[in-house]
Amino acid sequence: MSHAVSRLRDERLARSTKPFIARGSRAPRCPDCRVISSYCLCAWRPAVTAESGMCLLMYDTEPLKPTNTGWLIADVIKDTHAFGWSRIDVDEQLLALLDDPQWQPYIVFPGEFVAEERVVNKVSRMDGKRPLFILLDATWTEARKMFRKSPYLERFPVLTLEPEQISRYRLRRSRRDDHFCTAEVAALCLELAGDTCASGVLCVQRSLSGCQVPQADRPRRRGPHSFEGFYLKAFYHAVLRICPVWANCHPCYRATTLRA
C-alpha cells in the first residue's frame, strides 16, 4: 500500500542518474515496508487512529536511504505527508497543507536555536485544530540549514521536547545518547498530543524494525523457535500491552496468540 514517503521515494528515484548506495542497501528489502524481505511486516502493518498529523520535510536523499524511519511513521499515522525540501522551489502542496484550517502546525526543533517567544513545550488545541508536527528529516547539519532557510516556517511555534520526556523515553531504548531518529521524535510528539496508543505502537515498530538488521545475513530458520517467530511474538505482546483493543481485533495478532 503506497503512502506519502513511498511516493516521495519513487519521485526521487525517477530523478536519480546512478544507484544510491548507503548503509543497508545491499540487503534485499520489501518494496512496501522497506524491511529486509525475510522479515516483511506488510501483513502486520499497524492501523491505529490518531488526531495528530505528521509533515516530513526530507532532505534530498533521505527518501532513498534504506534505514530511513519516515517509512515507519507513514505506516502507523494515516495523516502523514512527505515533501522534498528545497530552499528555492517550495512545493505548492506543502504550502497548501500548512494553510489548511484544520491543522495547527508545530515545527519540532531545539529551543536553544530559536527566539524565546516562539518556543512551546506543550501541544494545545487552538480553536479545535488538530496538531500537525513538522519534522525535518535530515542529518543535524542539514536540519539546521533547512530551519534557517525556510522562511515559510517562521510563523509557526517551535515545539521543543522537555528533558524529562527525553529521559523517560531513553529508558525504553537500548542506546544511551541524545540523538533520536525521526520516528523516535514523532513518537514523543504523539505522546505530547495525547495520542498515546499511536505513540506506543510507533515505539514498538521502531524498536523491532532495528532487530532484523544484524540478523539479515544469517540463515533463516523456520518454525516457532526461529528469529522470525520470536520477532512477531515480541511485536504482538508489546502492542497488546499498549493498545489491547486494536491488537485483539487484528487477525494476524489473534493468530499469533493461538500459536504462542
PLM features: residue spans?
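S-adenosyl-L-methionine/SAH cofactor-binding core of RNA-modifying enzymes
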Residues: 78-148
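Short, intrinsically disordered C-terminal tails of secreted or membrane-associated proteins
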Residues: 254-259
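Short cysteine/histidine-rich zinc-coordinating motifs and their immediately flanking basic loops
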Residues: 41-56
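Residues immediately within or flanking Cys/His clusters that coordinate Zn2+
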Residues: 27, 37
